[in-house]
Amino acid sequence: MGLNHTLSLLKFLENPHKNLKIIHIAGTNGKGSTAATIYNILISSGYKVGLYTSPHLINFNERIRVNGVTITDEEIISFMKHVEPAVNEIKSTFFEVTTAMAFYHFKDHDVDIAIIETGLGGRLDSTNIVNPSLTVMTPISLDHMDILGDTIEKIAKEKAGIIKERVPLITAKQVNEVLKILEKRTKKKSSVMYICPNPESIQLNVDGTSFEVFGKIYTTSLIGCYQAQNAALAIAATKIINPKISSKSIDKGLRNVHWPGRLQLVSDNIYYDVAHNESGIKSVLKNLKIMFPNSNLYGLLCLKGDKEIDCIAECIKSQFEMLFVSTSKDGLLLSSKKL
């Protein structure tokens, strides 16, 4: 992590990020879903929108897209050939190169607005060289404690590092310790903080989630109570960007959003989720029990070796009728025996 390498690489590329209108998103859980929802609402409103997220689920190209079209292999190869001398000289990391690629791609495609998700933390994240029009903060909880800090306050300070001078912040509801840190940072930066209200009247089914917020009832194609919260935050963000965005555009964007790996129905009564920290897994289990209150749950679990295993084990204990564990041959995942 750090900013100097990214700045040097972007300078070589003639600073493609500087004239982009940007929404910058940080937080612990829900960043991708919130970013994808903002993206779809803005597209439905007639904007040409770039989206940069990480990590990818299936292939690298997913990280960078414009109006539903991912960056092509040819565009990736062309960019890498162009930037290779600078990368070798600067000794750029994978994420620094990927971030520069996103900005270059968005400038090349002349987007109206780019939605940029932080990779890890905020303060020293490679994306934190932008001067956005809006900062968005999803719920902050414990994750990546070996890098960001071992308390919620330390992690919140890292995330709050993306709040810029006089740039408004819209945040999801946060625990008091986090809220105090965000308030302090926005005050220091002469900014203003808006707190998104929690959605009400949430209803889940296999087709999505309906909820009420800002006096209207909406439905997102994503499943989960937390997806109602993510959608509410996305609606609030788009209304700050453009107060004239219509309810029709919001409705269309919410129904069109597709973000695989988030309580995704892959087959009859089989759901897949990429939750990888305690708060995320608790949310998944809570929503499954809401959807299937009288059913036994059977699970398949695999985790990378850098996760807080003890906390995760405690929160899934006794939640399943039967739990299977799996690993991978590449050594990235914990062994089945340890799990």
Where are each of the predicted segments found?
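Nucleotide phosphate-binding/pyrophosphate-handling subdomain across enzymes
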Residues: 19, 108-109, 113-118, 125-136, ...
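ATP-dependent carboxylate-amine ligase catalytic core
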Residues: 8-11, 15-18, 44-130, 146-148, ...
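C-terminal helical cap/extension that packs against the catalytic core
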Residues: 174-193, 205-208, 269-270, 310-339
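Conserved catalytic-core segment of NTP-binding enzymes
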Residues: 122-124, 131-188
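A conserved segment at the C-terminal end of the G1
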Residues: 24-25, 33-50
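Short internal beta-strands
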Residues: 52, 168-173, 298-301, 321-329
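N-terminal pre-Walker A segment at the start of P-loop NTPase domains
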Residues: 1-7
